[in-house]
Amino acid sequence: MKILVVGGGGREHAIIKKLKENQSVETVYALPGNGGMAEDAVCVPIGATDIGKIVDFAVENQIDYAVVAPDDPLVLGAVDALNGKGIPCFGPRANAAIIEGSKVFSKNLMKKYGIPTAEYEVFNDMDSALRYLETAPIPTVIKADGLALGKGVIIAQTRQEAQEAVKSMMADKVFGKSGEHIVIEEFLTGPEVSVLSFTDGKTVKPMISSMDHKRAGDNDTGLNTGGMGTVAPNPYYTPEIARECMEKIFLPTIQAMNAEGRTFTGCLYFGLMLTPKGPKVIEYNCRFGDPETQVVLPLLESDLLTVMQATTNGTLAETEVRFSDKNACCVILASKGYPVSYKKGYPITMTQEAKAHTYVAGAKLDETGKLVTSGGRVTGTTAIADTLEEAIREAYRLCDGVTFENAYRRSDIGQRALRALK
């Protein structure tokens, strides 16, 4: 089989490595991929949002199955376009990807169908948003409606911070069109849990839970990032909570999308907060999370391609989705200065042992064929072990085998989860 994977980050590298465990997969093409995954896939310099070229490539190369991993091409209709040429795909069509593409849509969906989430108001003009903030409870959460590279959510601790966030989105247009509408919602407290799930639009099969580490600095300080590391499973996510989420959140979401004529297939990511009043949805993503994928997929014991095809064929109910009962930890190595500004082009070296456990994100091959840094988050190194403590220790040991100038990592990935276990 010839498989096409759209995207070029660590998440895509993890998906590709897992797909290649299936003996029937002969070639995986990554569009655009990156220099660090060139040994695992044929990287083709076509951008992830260049849908016309992606479709042309898929047709010319007689692709048997496509996986569209990032949010942008999904929201832009990459699956619709590939399906239109008879190519089966993993991922939702554009009318379902809106569940991530528009925060206003997803909040209104939850309200309409009684899915637990934070109280909220939607604003289309800055003046009414600022007026509302004069009396709104603080802290509060300001969200840009559209996609904003994971940076479109501001937790404002003061009224002034909230007002500045609204102005930057609606007047300064820091997120462009994505900030034309905004959501202002109540600040929830409690442990956060990421649950990715496979769905064919009828059945939901959750993957193992995980815990992300969003802030750039140790002890959850500094700016929000795309994620500096993850552990799985998440110790806060008990079997009782899992049952409650399936009954009150996971299935109702899929049923709500069906009722709206927006059947969702692929990977639906539930960002949850376990509040004193029960689990609530903070966000939906219409795709695998990054770096959650780098701990979740290594623990998947079932064949990934088989499960993906079941979401496409509507046969997920009778397809086994089994996970290991071990623990995983992924440590991200980033460029110093991320997520603001950082230098690129530093050579990356990896020991053979580290390389086998590392997913490459922000890297490319230079003119001489040497792997150099090209982004904020450069690599993610994952270890699996019987206990969480061992997985964390091993992930850091393996991560020591990845080096480049001005590399930065958090030193406390998984420590919050360890405290929860004690």
Where in the sequence are the language-model features?
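ATP-binding N-terminal substructure of ATP-dependent carboxylate-amine bond-forming enzymes
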Residues: M1-A94
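Generic C-terminus detector
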Residues: L365-T368, V372-K422
